[in-house]
Amino acid sequence: MGKIFGNKMKKTITIFLLLMSVMGFSQTKITAVKVGDRIDVTINKFFFTSYLFAKNEKYPFFYPVNGPSGAGVTSMRNGIWPHHSSLFFGSDDVNGGNYWNKALSGGQIVSTREEIVENNGPRLVIENDCIWKRPDAPAPIQDFRKITITAPTKDIFQIDFEVTMEMLMDVSIAKTNHSLFSGRMDPSLSVDFGGTMIDADGVQGEKGTYGKPSPWIDCYGKRGDKIEGMAIMQHPSNNWYPAPWFTRDYGFFSPTPLNWPKDDKETLFKKGEKIHLKYRVLVHSGTHETANIAGEFKKFAAEK
């Protein structure tokens, strides 16, 4: 009798603790503080990321991007291709301008407004307006960004990145693998160092995923006794969905439709045309299976 009572008590305590854990997490507080030319983001006082928009940078970007363990999952100023800045949005070859790498004089995406519009609650919302400009040439594009940060579970931090690109003139973007939303993993999590890169069909590595359309790609690896990674998802409402991916085993991945234009030369846009793109980033513990990346994509795809 005592044994039965003891087992019931243990079960009750376990359920209670699980409920308390869920309730505690459902009260997640995400906070942003604007400090000079960056916005720092914390999740329950845990430092998650900064959104950087300094005037001496090529474009605004997120860095660091910390996983649930506290370690960063992305890299910036890496020895191989140092212009890859963690998690970012840009493009090369826009009306002859370069809004991706090299000197600022060749092109720069400059922030003109950064506003925290929802703060200190279960979700954080940042709005950011940008102008694509370079000296001695008219600006070809302005963009409007909405960044929403949530934490669905203690093991997943989520960034929703929505951007509307408005063409201020007729725009030609020459065929380029340097375009749109991109992530650069920390080398220790890359395929080159034993990590995994996998798409929605289970295809792995640069060899399998390069140039292949897929709704999402997840990159993760093991450091010490912990596995962490980052997935990028494309929303089905996006132009070119599902866009083919530009991938590298050293840790770069980007859904890059502009590298595969219909005429194999350029993608054209008319003045006044607007392109709206939505991406979801999941920074997670565990593998693509334990983080249920496929299931998380279904949730994302169901959202309007």
Protein language model regions, located:
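Positively charged n-region of N-terminal signal peptides that target proteins for export
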Residues: 2-3, 7-12
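Sec-dependent N-terminal signal peptides
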Residues: 12-22
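Beta-strand-rich N-terminal accessory domains
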Residues: 27-82, 286-288, 294
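Acidic (Asp/Glu-rich), glycine- and aromatic
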Residues: 54-57, 61-64, 152-197
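Beta-strand elements of well-folded, non-transmembrane domains
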Residues: 69, 130-134, 147-151, 165-169, ...
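Extended, loop-rich substrate-binding clefts of extracytoplasmic carbohydrate-active enzymes
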Residues: 86-155
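Active-site/ligand-binding surface loops and adjacent short beta/alpha elements
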Residues: 170-173, 177-242
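Beta-strand-rich recognition/accessory modules
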Residues: 231-304
